[in-house]
Amino acid sequence: MARAFTLTADGGSRGNPGPAGYGAVVSEDGKIVAELYDYIGVATNNVAEYQGLIAGLTHIHSLDPEATVEVQMDSKLVVEQMSGRWQIKHSNMRELAAQARAAHTPSLVKYSWIPRDLNSHADRLANKALDNESGGSESHVPVQINYLTDRLRSDEVPTTIYLIRHGETPMTPERRFSGSSHN
């Protein structure tokens, strides 16, 4: 059975056009699967919004090409254009919309507009991308946060789990394992 994801995405530009970045949050069953953000150089806020959408859909497609996706964005323009209710007049926006459609099967994606205050997580990531801007380099790799360690406070130590498999023991043929109820 195909998985179901929620994608919230946001983009921002300081100057419009100006330095721009995006943030995207991928969730499954209410749990965050991935946080993505990237600085994209000088662009408009609409270009940054589309880039966040494309990054999120691309990531979801890499997890499960047949997954259904609920996209939630505070950009009325992107939501309405991707839903087919508004025309896409500018050629650069048409190209970005085509990239978004190519990133994941359009029939598996549903778009919803949400108020800005419900998109604060993706907005924070977009601002993080802008704050961490790396001097205008043209080659950027989107950052995926390791959700288990990158969100720790400075005084916390990440838990390390080791799975050790020892192979067969004298009890293996009898199916007697540590913690089992057999005597």
Model region roles, listed by residue range:
Residues 1-47, 51, 58-63, 161-167, ...:
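RNase H-like nuclease fold core
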Residues 12-16, 53-126:
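RNase H catalytic domain
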Residues 20, 34, 67, 107, ...:
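Residue-level signal for beta-strand positions within conserved beta-sheet cores that form or flank
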Residues 38, 84-86, 112, 175, ...:
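Flexible, active-site-adjacent loop/turn segments at secondary-structure boundaries
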Residues 41-43, 82-85, 155-158:
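N-terminal start-of-chain detector that recognizes signal peptides
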Residues 66, 136-138, 179-181:
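Short amphipathic alpha-helical leader/targeting segments
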Residues 88-89, 93-176:
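Terminal low-complexity/intrinsically disordered segments and their adjoining alpha-helical capping regions
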